[in-house]
Amino acid sequence: AGVPFNTKTPYGPT
């Protein structure tokens, strides 16, 4: 992805 949607990981699983 390109936007931080997860609080644990900045960008989550891309």
UniProtKB/Swiss-Prot annotation:
Top-level taxon of the source organism: Bacteria
Gene: celA
A GO MF label: cellulase activity
Enzyme Commission designation: 3.2.1.4
Species per Swiss-Prot/TrEMBL record: Acetivibrio thermocellus (Hungateiclostridium thermocellum)
EC category name: hydrolase
Keyword Hydrolase set for record: yes
Keyword Nucleus on entry: no
GO biological process: cellulose catabolic process
Keywords linked to the UniProt accession: Carbohydrate metabolism, Cellulose degradation, Glycosidase, Hydrolase, Polysaccharide degradation
Catalyzed reaction equations: Endohydrolysis of (1->4)-beta-D-glucosidic linkages in cellulose, lichenin and cereal beta-D-glucans
The family this protein is said to belong to: Belongs to the glycosyl hydrolase 8 (cellulase D) family.
Function: This enzyme catalyzes the endohydrolysis of 1,4-beta-glucosidic linkages in cellulose, lichenin and cereal beta-D-glucans.
Protein name, entry field: Endoglucanase A
